[in-house]
Amino acid sequence: MLSQKKQDLTITIIDKTTHKVLPNAHVSIGRKHAYTNLNGNAIFHQIFNQISEEISEEKSPKKLLKITHVGYVNYQKIVDFSKKHTILLIALTQDNAILNEVTITQKPVKNFIKYSGNKQKINTEFLAQNRDNSLMQTLQNIPGVSAITIGSGQSKPTIRGLGFNRVVVVENGIKHEAQQWGADHGLEIDQYNVESIEITKGAASLMYGSDAIAGVINIKNNTLPNVNSLAGEVNITHKNNNNLYGISFGVKQRYKHWYYKTRITHQQYGDYKVPVRKITYDNYIFDLHQNNLRNTAGKNHNIGFSLGYTDDALSSTTYISNVHAKNGFFANAHGLEVRTSKIDYDKSSNDIDLPLHKVNHFKINNNTRFSLKNNTLDIEIGFQKNDREEHSEPIAHGYMSKPTSTMERRFTKNTYNFNIKNENYYFDNYKIVTGINLDYQHNKIAGWGFLIPEYTRFTVGAFVYNQLKINKNIHIDAGIRYDYGNLKTQAYYESFVSPVNKNGIISMQKLQRSTKNNLHFDNFSASAGISYSLKNTLYKINIGKSFRIPLANELASNGVNYHMYRYEQGKIDLKPESSYQIDAEFKADFSEFNNFKKASVQLTPFANYFDNYIYLTPTSGYYETLQKYKYTQNKVFRYGGEITLEYTPIKKIAFTASLEYVKSRQLNGEKKNFSLPFSPPLTGVFSFEYTFNDWVFFEKTKFFSNLRSTVNQHDIVPPEKPTNGATVINAGLHTNISVFSKKNPMKIQGKLNNIFNKTVFNHTSFYRLIEVPEPNRNFSISIIQTF
């Protein structure tokens, strides 16, 4: 037995800072793999016998030892196993320990070196410091990422000027499915229930299928709690601009194998203020009472729970969440003048009056990983129910009498997701990933207003992805994917009759707004790239083809969209979008010593071509005084990129400067030589941070500020309006105070946005079309106490 044990190797993994053991770390020696147990040990049985045999066959005893763990920097080292050390102790560095300096100063965090695409990881430090009214507004300081804002509490992501269903949002492995096609739709995710985010800029259809044509926002809440631990957090927030009060309470506990996490969040806010007293829209001038953008108040109630099990061979977590929001829409821009309404909108700035929307998003999904000898198998299954209601004051339209209900539209969308992925490690320098994704959606409609029909959508895709390590500096990856989609739309008839003139004979009929259709789509996606890294420089290039299946609104919409004050009409014979893209990246670190990076530069250019880009274009037709818009397809060419400079002259001071640029051009059609809607202007962000010495009971005190500047955006698509450039300065102060314990200090942060109260228009805002500027000066304070 003793001699047998001498042939075994035990590798113990610990945290470099806390010296605690780390269970569930993935350890590989050549083609052999293992996971650390609850004691932080990974045991490789009889490994020295095998190495002795390889030595006798004149093979090298040196092997690549690789260790990965969620929340820690990857460890790689060539080890000579001929020395037969039966026990190895290895300490991993926390991701935050290296990334804190990056994220707190709004720098893009560490890129994924082996992957040839453009990925960035955002951690909790960045999220806490940049916390805004919504998750996507929190992320808009990342170069290349921006948000389409809907009032003060809702927003949706755009990546390099593309948004809606061209950006996939993934939460805990499952694609988030709601009514993201709508311009007035926000993202139903609790931003306090997020531990890290991976952002992929560029085509990602290979791994995620249709809709990932512009990129992916991958939201994760999967960090394992420490063994036999109980921890929690209370987060209290107040913002004075819209009188927001919020509280978020989270608890997590782990036993040996089982663990759970839970979080409850509540926010309530009033109408937000803008730095103007009048707004001009559609030839009307609207006075704003006390600078309040009337009826933009709202509230959110969110709850999340996860239950998990982990051991050496199996890891499984079930996530359950429910996000509920109720928000008002600016009352002067919903197709109904406020002066004709009996609602006293200015009575209180905290009321949520008509028009408004209510949305409830329920989600349950399970992620299970099987750790086998030479591969890992991941299975993800989920169900989502998105229930969205839009309410407005009922009035008669055309031949429709006044409705008895305020519910203008209701969309109830049920989505079923299934993903399976297998990663094989049969060879030292080669990894192959295969996977299948299935999604089924059923979207029901209700209400007296019609925009899109009821539909079902089924998609299935299969992919193969390969990573090859040529040497320690060069990595190559490539893959191919095939997708099939089926979309069925239902017929819809108006509930009232209208006169129809057919061959001179007038009859009263219920008009048909949509027909029954059964549509099929299929396409291939592919990508290939190379990553070349030296000591202080990194080079990447990736080429790929992506596609997107047309949505129900693009194919079959046929109704009035009062939020956008227009009539929208789909085109049933639209083809899938295809995009051909090339991405590159160059990164260099300068004067690096003792893990102190004094300066760095990162450049990420891109170019892509659409052979059939789908968009909504105005026509010369009208419906009840509303201009008609129709969906069409054109060829589009886009290019641009981001550049980021970082400079840390001393450890107390850090500077960051970034610049992002996107240029789009339609190559044919009625809008030839025009740009694309919601194209962001040239934007620069300059950030500064100073860290103070600890003083009395104030610890880790930091002053931070950023200057965000945009140039004029005159490259527009009517009915968009040109937007003048502007510069906004924000600043804040963060400190820790040991109130209850030294181990868990209270974190206090105050932040002042738009310090000089400037009137600024955001070109990608939902309210830009109606001349509504961004909020005026806002002071926010947050208090976080962990235990």
Name the predicted role of every residue range.
Residues 235, 240, 349-367, 505-533, ...:
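Outer-membrane beta-barrel signature, preferentially recognizing the C-terminal barrel domain
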Residues 242-269, 280-330, 360, 366, ...:
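Transmembrane beta-barrel wall of Gram-negative outer-membrane proteins
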Residues 45-47, 51, 59, 174-201:
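Short acidic/polar hinge/loop motifs at secondary-structure boundaries
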Residues 600-610, 614, 628-713, 784:
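Gram-negative outer-membrane beta-barrel transporters
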Residues 269, 275, 547, 611-612, ...:
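C-terminal beta-signal and adjacent terminal beta-strands/loops
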Residues 14, 26, 68-72, 83-128, ...:
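Short, acidic, small-residue-rich periplasmic hinge/interaction motif at the N-terminus
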Residues 86-91, 101, 135-138, 153-158, ...:
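N-terminal periplasmic accessory domains that precede
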